[in-house]
């Protein structure tokens, strides 16, 4: 890339990843057009408008993935698009029409807007680890060449299945459109994103990441064999790939692998005020982690800066500051019950959300 500092578009700009990315881009000197579904929602836009540099280089634009063409105006004249927005409704009663269809059609609407603009040099799409490793027989390691088994996801309908399917199908559709229309398209594939955040509510990624603290057993299966990346590292990688002249294709963005046992020990050591469970029904004490390889990203010269401890320290302190989790004395959930599902191999990486 030629170092042009914008303007660039960030979709889903009020979300967990989107808002942090807007902050990082402003810090780097970019002019940013932030798209949100409802610019009148002060709770969503206030954290963005208060960022350093926002007064001079940030504008808020209305756009919705479910409305074809709604991104055209924001994208017109831009040099780059960071597509982060995605529907995330794990409780949807009609996932095909409420999650999968708007994700894929919204992706293609954005691709068409980029083609029409004629100024967009690169599109960076935030995909998910769920587009890579969801299959009947998990492997010990994955890289950017692996794809989830869509038929398996639709048949088994594990937690978050519609999110995994939507990301994989949107990514494939965008890659095909980019190839046919001469667009420069890159997808970055984060694993479970953990760290500090700007938004007011609890990000879905942290509902999962902090499940051992909150006692949310339904999310333990995801932590069984989990891969992690710090939010700040992810956003740095997104900007890095946007600017790197040789970047192309898919990139895993994952700095650490862990098991639920290792996370439980680490959290108990660092936060003894919480009663963290240490035993999990049906989970082998010698369980080995599953590795997600970021070699392709690292080979370009990128480096991760944060440890697993950094991720959780920042996430927990931010949640405490916002009153989203108690300061301590959380009763530990009993072993068994939903934990038995861990033995069935349901643990999968979810990745990022807006």
Curated annotation (Swiss-Prot):
EC number of the protein: 1.1.1.219, 1.1.1.234
GO biological process: anthocyanin-containing compound biosynthetic process
Amino acids binding NADP(+): 44, 163
Taxonomy, superkingdom: Eukaryota
Catalysis: reaction(s): a (2R,3S,4S)-leucoanthocyanidin + NADP(+) = a (2R,3R)-dihydroflavonol + NADPH + H(+); (2S)-flavan-4-ol + NADP(+) = (2S)-flavanone + NADPH + H(+)
Record-linked Pfam families: Epimerase (PF01370)
CDD domains in alphabetical order: FR_SDR_e
InterPro entries in the cross-refs: Epimerase_deHydtase, NAD(P)-bd_dom_sf, NAD(P)_dehydrat-like
Single GO MF descriptor: dihydrokaempferol 4-reductase activity
Residue stretches spanning the membrane: none
Pathway, per record: Pigment biosynthesis; anthocyanin biosynthesis
Keyword terms, alphabetized: Flavonoid biosynthesis, NADP, Oxidoreductase
Enzyme class: oxidoreductase
Presence of the UniProt keyword Cytoplasm in the record: no
NAD found in the keyword field: no
Family: Belongs to the NAD(P)-dependent epimerase/dehydratase family. Dihydroflavonol-4-reductase subfamily.
Role summary: Bifunctional enzyme involved in flavonoid metabolism.
Name of this chain's protein: Dihydroflavonol 4-reductase
Species of origin: Hordeum vulgare (Barley)
């Amino acid at each position: 890339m030629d170092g042009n500092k914008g303007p660039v578009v960030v979709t889903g700009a009020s979300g967990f990843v989107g808002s942090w990315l807007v902050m990082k881009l402003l810090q780097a000197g970019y002019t940013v057009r932030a798209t949100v579904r409802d610019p009148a929602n002060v709770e969503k836009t206030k954290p963005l408008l208060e960022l350093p540099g926002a007064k001079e280089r940030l504008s808020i634009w209305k756009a919705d993935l479910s409305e074809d063409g709604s991104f055209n105006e924001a994208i017109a004249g831009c040099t780059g698009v960071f597509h982060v927005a995605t529907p995330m409704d794990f409780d949807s009663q009609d996932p095909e029409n409420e999650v999968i269809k708007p994700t894929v059609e919204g992706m293609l609407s954005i691709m068409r807007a980029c083609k029409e603009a004629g100024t967009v040099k690169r599109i960076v799409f935030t995909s998910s680890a769920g587009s890579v490793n969801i299959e009947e027989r998990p492997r010990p390691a994955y890289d950017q060449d692996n794809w989830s088994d869509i038929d398996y996801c639709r048949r088994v309908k594990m937690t978050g299945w519609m999110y995994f399917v939507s990301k994989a199908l949107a990514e494939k559709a965008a890659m095909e459109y980019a190839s046919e229309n001469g667009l420069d398209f890159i997808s970055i594939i984060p694993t479970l994103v953990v760290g500090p955040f700007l938004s007011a509510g609890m990000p879905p990624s942290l509902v999962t990441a902090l499940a051992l603290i909150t006692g949310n057993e339904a999310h333990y299966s995801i932590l069984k064999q989990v891969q992690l990346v710090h939010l700040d590292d992810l956003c740095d990688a997104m900007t890095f790939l946007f600017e790197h002249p040789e970047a192309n294709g898919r990139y895993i963005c994952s700095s650490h692998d862990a098991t639920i046992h290792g996370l439980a020990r680490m959290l108990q050591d660092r936060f003894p005020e919480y009663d963290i469970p240490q035993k999990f029904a049906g989970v082998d004490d010698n369980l080995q982690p599953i590795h997600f390889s970021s070699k392709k990203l690292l080979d370009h010269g990128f480096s991760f800066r944060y440890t697993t401890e950094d991720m959780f320290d920042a996430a927990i302190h931010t949640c405490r500051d916002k009153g989203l989790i108690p300061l301590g004395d959380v009763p530990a959930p009993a072993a068994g019950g939903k934990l038995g599902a861990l033995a069935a191999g349901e643990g999968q990486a979810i990745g990022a959300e807006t």
